[in-house]
Amino acid sequence: MDLKWLQTFIAAAESESFREAAEHLYLTQPAVSQHMRKLEDELDMRLFLHSGRRVVLTDEGRLFLPYAKEMIHVYQAGKQKVSQWKQGYSRSLTLAVHPYIASYILPRFLPAYIQKHPHVELSTHVAGSDAIKQAVEHNEADIGLSRKDPNTNTLYYQHICEGTLCLAAPFQESRPDAASVLTRYRLLTHDHPSYGDAFLDNIRSHYPYLQMMAVGQTDTAVHMMKAGMGASFLPTYIIKQEEAEKKLMAVSTPAHLELPASQTFMMWKRNSEDIQHFHAMLHDFMQREQV
């Protein structure tokens, strides 16, 4: 059996169209029809019924479809394993990470991890906190790194760092106080999951004329502050890096604002040796860096 026949069958089943399957696979429509005839002959069953310009799966076709997908998956997984072996990798870890962690923590942590574990292939995808939890639960990621407590019974998880927040503003030579910063700039909000509406309500109660603008992501807030468009409460870890380059600066914050802590959580589903090594190194790194 030719795997190309299976790929064509799956494409036609999902699109319900030989024409669309041909476009998706860069084949001619007659080639798609030929693949289906050969597959039906091989299996001794009819897979499709024609309905106008569309095709629909027969009962046999519906039964066979998940097995066709599994055969393609096994083939691709085996091919990937051989490719990893040729590149010198013997194991792999997939990370689902919060945007803040991807931008500000992993670039400083991963070089040390890779140097110590050169045979582990790493892949990452960036997602929101809820999507990170779902990715680990559904085995789409081995490790999740989030700024939100997953609060679940289905995963292992650990709070690996509690950092601090501070008020950040565009850099200037003389250091202003919080009142002058919040008078001069709009406060960029909802860029970090460590605080919520209660914290913002407390700020409003002390600075009733303060203007706010929701931006959604830490990176967005940092870039907007560098452009002089606002101030924000961000992890001290970020501000230390930006202040050294004279791009942003930390501003002393009055105690009555009661700054929340900046949290980082790691979650995982299976207790493999590779995951435990990753956890131990990341925990030590976060404690040293006080992220």
Curated annotation (Swiss-Prot):
Residues 1-58 form the HTH lysR-type domain. Transmembrane segments: none annotated. Keywords: DNA-binding, Transcription, Transcription regulation. Residues 18-37 bind DNA. InterPro entries: LysR_subst-bd, Tscrpt_reg_HTH_LysR, WH-like_DNA-bd_sf, WH_DNA-bd_sf. Disulfide bonds: none annotated. CDD domains: PBP2_LTTR_substrate. It holds the Pfam family HTH_1. The keyword Lipoprotein does not apply. GO terms for biological process: regulation of DNA-templated transcription. One of its GO terms (molecular function) is DNA-binding transcription factor activity. PANTHER family: HTH-TYPE TRANSCRIPTIONAL REGULATOR, HTH-TYPE TRANSCRIPTIONAL REGULATOR CITR. Belongs to the LysR transcriptional regulatory family. This is Uncharacterized HTH-type transcriptional regulator YxjO. It comes from Bacillus subtilis (strain 168). The gene is yxjO.
